[in-house]
């Protein structure tokens, strides 16, 4: 009988600082029996214990852990503190509990397989297929396949984890010497120059700079830990949230979100000697200018994506990128890196992160509860006035974007802009997903009424119906029409298609992928650089 995995136990290490983000409304993970699990929180290390012999209708339980405590959160909503020690991260498996029960089975031995680690530079993404069973005798794969680099805090030593497949297949000891990687001894700033042309409608600083770079080193935002506690829940996403209903794991702590679409297949190292590149300019304007193709196109770079994919876009007129975070993913210096204040969780550290005339995109889809970080418009405006606007006025931020709304967020944006008339907003950030080109036209034309440049930082051709997604020809047709429209629209300053990856999840569909399965440009990718 075919073995499936419906029981998944997650042990989460406490995470430090602001984490990067990948879009979070496409988190389907399926096997032939249906949805196994969906989760939204980016975490530094994920451990999965798969229990064979169950099907996807069985209960499953998630666990989160720091170094001193473990919380069990089962499918019926119960939460129970589990015993542990200061040197262990406990991973337990669970059987399907009796009705209205969170009974948990604690086998004498079990396999804890860390699938990957991540850091503020490179976040992992998940596979759309079942997690393979691993045993102490045959671990799922070598560490180099599943691991990206993990930044050590200043108190941790600089050794790599895991040391061997034996460690991968055994329960994990959370001593600081095991889960570390290359950490830069110092963070030097190398500068390069770029040019800018002020948009007529933008606020112009007398001397402003824009942050960009090809960072390959990690810089921690703070030393404080965020305790994460996730619970498996069933989330019904409304039509306003793109009409998808999926089970979801919601986080009770401040965190970011992640696309869970493909297994990280190669390690991305953080070199100890690498430096953050921060491109600056002393031009009289804060508005960026690009070259080639339209001069507007960029990359919505999903953290954890193979860096080699970016080579397909070098010297092809794609000259900027962002990654939903505040630290570069390490792409070529030919791409300007644009920062994102993804949510409100790390605002207190904004003054140390946004410096030197940085370009900053605002909160990510705060109008959507499904985005994992909903903020009402009035509160968002107050955050801008308290944390971001002073940085814009001082020149630390040289070009400040509005929150990036979804294409059902125009009312939210209207309320925000009314409450934030003194916020020094330089450009409107937005997302759009759909299949009707005329709807995209109407959306952009409506946003143009604010009289500010527009950045369309996510868009793709999808109806969110994974049983009847648009065909490749339909995607190509919409992209071709959209590129011509956006290139010719006087208010559109920048845009980025979702996404330069091979796997985009069931919601968006892989026909939108700019990268083919072989790692080169897909047919859609070829159109994007033409």
Curated annotation (Swiss-Prot):
Q: Name one GO cellular component term.
A: fungal-type cell wall
Q: Which Gene3D superfamilies match?
A: Glycosidases
What is the name listed in the Swiss-Prot or TrEMBL entry for this protein?
Alkali-sensitive linkage protein 1
An example Pfam family from this entry, by short name, is Glyco_hydro_cc
Q: Where in the cell is it found?
A: Endoplasmic reticulum; Golgi apparatus; Secreted, Cell wall
The signal peptide stretch is 1-18
Q: Which PANTHER family match?
A: ALKALI-SENSITIVE LINKAGE PROTEIN 1
Which residues bear sugar attachments?
55, 120, 128
Keyword hit for tRNA-binding: no
For this chain, the annotated S-S bridges are: none
């Amino acid at each position: 009988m075919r073995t499936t995995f419906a029981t998944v136990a997650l042990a989460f290490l406490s995470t430090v600082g602001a984490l990067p983000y990948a879009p979070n409304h496409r988190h389907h993970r399926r096997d032939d029996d249906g949805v196994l699990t969906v989760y939204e929180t980016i975490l530094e290390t994920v451990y999965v214990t798969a229990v064979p012999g169950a099907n996807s209708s069985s209960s499953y339980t998630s666990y989160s852990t720091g170094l001193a405590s473990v919380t069990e959160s089962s499918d019926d909503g119960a939460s129970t503190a589990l015993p542990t020690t200061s040197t262990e991260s406990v991973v337990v498996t669970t059987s399907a509990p009796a009705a209205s029960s969170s009974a948990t089975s604690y086998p004498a031995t079990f396999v804890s397989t860390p699938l990957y680690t991540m850091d503020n530079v490179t976040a992992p993404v998940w596979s759309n297929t079942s997690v393979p069973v691993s045993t102490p005798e045959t671990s799922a794969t070598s560490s180099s396949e599943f691991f990206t680099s993990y930044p050590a805090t200043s108190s941790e030593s600089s050794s790599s984890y895991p040391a061997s497949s034996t460690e991968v297949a055994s329960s994990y000891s959370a001593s600081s010497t095991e889960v570390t990687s290359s950490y830069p001894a110092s963070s030097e700033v190398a500068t390069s120059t770029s040019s800018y042309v002020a948009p007529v409608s933008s606020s112009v600083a007398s001397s402003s700079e824009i942050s960009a770079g090809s960072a390959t080193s990690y810089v921690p935002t703070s030393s404080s830990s965020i305790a994460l506690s996730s619970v498996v829940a069933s989330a019904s996403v409304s039509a306003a949230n793109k009409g998808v209903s999926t089970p979801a794991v919601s986080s009770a702590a401040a965190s970011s979100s992640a696309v869970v679409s493909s297994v990280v297949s190669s390690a991305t190292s953080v070199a100890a000697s690498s430096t953050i590149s921060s491109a600056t300019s002393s031009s009289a304007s804060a508005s960026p200018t690009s070259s080639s193709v339209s001069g507007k196109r960029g990359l919505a770079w999903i953290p954890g994506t193979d860096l080699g994919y970016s080579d397909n876009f070098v010297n092809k007129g794609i000259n900027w990128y962002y990654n939903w975070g505040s630290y570069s993913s390490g792409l070529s210096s030919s791409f300007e890196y644009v920062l994102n204040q993804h949510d409100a969780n790390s605002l207190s550290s904004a003054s140390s992160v946004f410096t030197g005339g940085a370009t900053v995109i605002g909160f990510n889809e705060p109008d959507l509860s499904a985005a994992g970080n909903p903020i009402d418009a009035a509160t968002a405006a107050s955050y801008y006035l308290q944390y971001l606007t002073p940085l814009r006025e001082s020149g630390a931020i040289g070009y400040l974007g509005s929150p990036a709304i979804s294409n059902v967020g125009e009312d939210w944006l209207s309320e925000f802009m009314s409450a934030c008339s003194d916020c020094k907003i330089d450009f409107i950030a937005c997302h759009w997903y759909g299949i009707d080109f005329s709807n995209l036209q109407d959306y952009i034309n409506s946003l143009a009424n604010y009289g500010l440049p527009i950045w369309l930082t996510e868009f793709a051709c999808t109806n969110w119906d994974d049983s009847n997604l648009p065909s490749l020809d339909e995607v190509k047709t919409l992209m071709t029409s959209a590129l011509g429209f956006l290139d010719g629209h006087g208010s559109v300053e920048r845009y980025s298609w979702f996404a330069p990856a091979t796997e985009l999840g069931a919601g968006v569909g892989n026909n939108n992928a700019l990268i083919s399965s072989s790692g080169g440009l897909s047919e859609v990718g070829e159109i994007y650089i033409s």
